[in-house]
């Protein structure tokens, strides 16, 4: 059996639709009710498909067509006249149609729906095509109880919806802050009076004051913690300024900075009137050295004078302090400490003159008036 049509159809819209129009015209001309089609429908339902199976039992192509004809014979088909009557609105004999469910059950149980193993080459399909494959509607009654159970179940308690946040105006916030600066806690009459002034409820005023008190306490706590942290960091920095012994040793071992006089600057000798940079520091250093030398000389002179006085006294033990004729100088020095002080002052005068000479020599070195 060839599946290709005998005549090819052009691809225009009018040529494609023309066969449908002709079939509708034929259906309209036939007319009639649904009585004759229903009789044909019932006869076709009871007709066994054995002739079609015997005709197409040879070959693979024959088996396919046998299944096709078997299905066509078992499944009820409506003729064109029945379709035309339905389309034209002739529904007078629709009451004679049997229910679809009964038709399906009768056709499934009868031999017209599934044959007794039409082809031995398809034994596996027969177990899927038994009478038990029909829809069992008796077990569907349990689904109705699910609806009753769902109705009897209590609805789950939904979470309470949070109220929308009320935003205060700038004037209300200003008045609340001004009153908070004056008084952090309000009594009930004061709260009601303030709420009536700014058009709020006493509960809103109460909650605002509670939140603002908590906010101010938290800010003060954060500020105190920040100050404490700054103090700790400052103390750590001050303690670090002293340094450990290793750092002190490193500073002591590092070379000192010594001021060096500048004799020539930019290829020209420096003038005597214009001291070079660092001259003041160098001059102060020279003065300090001169003072140290003078103090050392004073100490040495005092030690010498005291030693000579003691030796004189030990060499002449028989002499009394009154015998000033033999050694008047020694007696005078031993008797009066003021004389020793005068001698030390004379030595200090000499040292001061020596320091002046040192400063002069340093200045000559500094200003380039060299030797």
UniProtKB/Swiss-Prot annotation:
Modifications the protein undergoes after translation, according to the UniProt entry: Phosphorylated on serine residues by STK3/MST2.
Outcome following mutation: residue 172 to H: In BHC; decrease in DNA-binding; no effect on transcription activation from thyroglobulin/TG, nor from pulmonary surfactant-associated protein C/SFTPC gene promoters
Modified residues (Phosphoserine): 254
Superkingdom of this protein's organism: Eukaryota
Annotated GO biological process: anatomical structure formation involved in morphogenesis; axon guidance; brain development; cell differentiation; cerebral cortex cell migration; cerebral cortex GABAergic interneuron differentiation; club cell differentiation; developmental induction
Alphabetized CDD domains for the sequence: homeodomain
GO MF term list: DNA binding; DNA-binding transcription factor activity; DNA-binding transcription factor activity, RNA polymerase II-specific; enzyme binding; intronic transcription regulatory region sequence-specific DNA binding; RNA polymerase II cis-regulatory region sequence-specific DNA binding; RNA polymerase II transcription regulatory region sequence-specific DNA binding; RNA polymerase II-specific DNA-binding transcription factor binding
UniProt note on tissues of expression: Thyroid and lung.
Compositionally biased tracts (Low complexity): 244-253, 272-294
A family per Pfam: Homeodomain
Ranges annotated as DNA-binding: 161-220
Quaternary organization: Interacts with WWTR1.
Known disease link: Chorea, hereditary benign: A rare autosomal dominant movement disorder, defined by early onset in childhood, a stable or non-progressive course of chorea, and no mental deterioration. Chorea is characterized by involuntary, forcible, rapid, jerky movements that may be subtle or become confluent, markedly altering normal patterns of movement. Choreoathetosis and congenital hypothyroidism with or without pulmonary dysfunction: An autosomal dominant disorder that manifests in infancy with neurological disturbances, hypothyroidism, and respiratory problems. It is characterized by movement abnormalities beginning with muscular hypotonia followed by the development of chorea, athetosis, dystonia, ataxia, and dysarthria.
Name of the protein in question: Homeobox protein Nkx-2.1
Gene this chain is encoded by: NKX2-1
């Amino acid at each position: 059996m060839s599946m290709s049509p005998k005549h090819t159809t052009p691809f225009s819209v009018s040529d494609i639709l023309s066969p449908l129009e002709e079939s509708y015209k034929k259906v309209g001309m036939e007319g009639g009710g649904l009585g004759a089609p229903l009789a044909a429908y019932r006869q076709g339902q009871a007709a066994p498909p054995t002739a079609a199976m015997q005709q197409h039992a040879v070959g693979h192509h024959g088996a396919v067509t046998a299944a096709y004809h078997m299905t066509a014979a078992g499944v009820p088909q409506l003729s064109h006249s029945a379709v035309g009557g339905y389309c034209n609105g002739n529904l007078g004999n629709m009451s004679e149609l049997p229910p679809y469910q009964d038709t399906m059950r009768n056709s499934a149980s009868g031999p017209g729906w599934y044959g007794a193993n039409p082809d031995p080459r398809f034994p596996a399909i027969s177990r899927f095509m038994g009478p038990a494959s029909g829809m069992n509607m008796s077990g569907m009654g349990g689904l109705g109880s699910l609806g009753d159970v769902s109705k009897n179940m209590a609805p789950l308690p939904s979470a309470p919806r949070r109220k929308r946040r009320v935003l205060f105006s700038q004037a209300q916030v200003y008045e609340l802050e001004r009153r908070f600066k004056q008084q952090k806690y309000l009594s009930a009459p004061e709260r009601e009076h303030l709420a009536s002034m700014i058009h709020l409820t006493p509960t809103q005023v109460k909650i605002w004051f509670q939140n603002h008190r908590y906010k101010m306490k938290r800010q003060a706590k954060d500020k105190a913690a920040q100050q404490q942290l700054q103090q700790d960091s400052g103390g750590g920095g001050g303690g670090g300024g002293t340094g450990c012994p290793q750092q002190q040793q490193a500073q002591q071992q590092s070379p000192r900075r010594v001021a060096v006089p500048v004799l020539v600057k930019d290829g020209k000798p420096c003038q005597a009137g214009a001291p070079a940079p660092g001259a003041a520091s160098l001059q102060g250093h020279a003065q300090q050295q001169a003072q140290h030398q003078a103090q050392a000389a004073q100490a040495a002179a005092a030690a010498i004078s005291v030693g000579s006085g003691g030796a004189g006294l030990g060499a002449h033990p028989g002499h009394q302090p009154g015998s000033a004729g033999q050694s008047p100088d020694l007696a005078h020095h031993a008797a009066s400490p003021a004389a020793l002080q005068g001698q030390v002052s004379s030595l200090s005068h000499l040292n001061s003159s020596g320091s002046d000479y040192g400063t002069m020599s340093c200045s000559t070195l500094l200003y380039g008036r060299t030797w």
